[in-house]
């Protein structure tokens, strides 16, 4: 028979079936505590990393040396082959790597110049549209008689200003 154990959210100790206190926060997050001591410390916002009897403290201060020795770290080995990047074959990458710095700089500057020209072109187009729109607005304003705008009555009312 296998017992389903859970871990205390504060102390990190095992909680066996029929034990523990379940706390459900207003955001529907469930916390399971081993006993009222863990629950009380959690609600008082004590940090489990500062209490010597909790699992978090023991882990931070390297107290469980026996468990750490069991976990062997596997050394990351570099793979001997070289993979091609999506969109570029291995030959293209080798060719670019062999390229002289002067050629690379010239290509970069040409690309930057092209981008700047494109940005300048879009700015000029926006300016032209803006000028055209402003001239249309002035024509529309010129069509309205000034007397119609001035014939408004005096402003009346308390106005909802600040006190």
UniProtKB/Swiss-Prot annotation:
Keywords: Cytoplasm, Nucleus, Ribonucleoprotein, Ribosomal protein
SMART domains: TRASH
Gene3D superfamilies noted in UniProt: 6.10.250.1270, Ribosomal protein L24e
Phenotypic effect of disruption: Abnormal leaf patterning, with the abaxial mesophyll features appearing in the adaxial mesophyll domain.
CDD domains referenced in this protein's UniProt entry, alphabetically: Ribosomal_L24e_L24
Region (Disordered): 119-163
GO biological process, one term: leaf morphogenesis
Source organism, top-level taxon: Eukaryota
Subcellular locations according to the entry: Cytoplasm; Nucleus; Nucleus, Nucleolus; Nucleus, Nucleoplasm
A GO term, aspect molecular function: mRNA binding
Regions of compositional bias (Basic and acidic residues) in chain numbering: 119-133
Tissue: Ubiquitous.
Any one annotated GO CC term: nucleoplasm
A Pfam family this chain is assigned to: Ribosomal_L24e
Nucleotide-binding recorded as keyword: no
Keyword Cytoplasm among record annotations: yes
Main location: cytoplasm
Quaternary structure note: Interacts with REIL1 and REIL2. Component of the large ribosomal subunit.
Similarity remark: Belongs to the eukaryotic ribosomal protein eL24 family.
PANTHER family assigned: 60S RIBOSOMAL PROTEIN L24, LARGE RIBOSOMAL SUBUNIT PROTEIN EL24Y-RELATED
Protein function: Might have an extraribosomal function in reinitiation of translation of ETTIN and MONOPTEROS genes that are involved in the auxin-mediated gynoecium patterning. Essential in leaf polarity establishment, probably having a role for translation in leaf dorsoventral patterning to specify leaf adaxial identity.
Protein name, UniProt field: Large ribosomal subunit protein eL24y
Gene name of this polypeptide: RPL24B
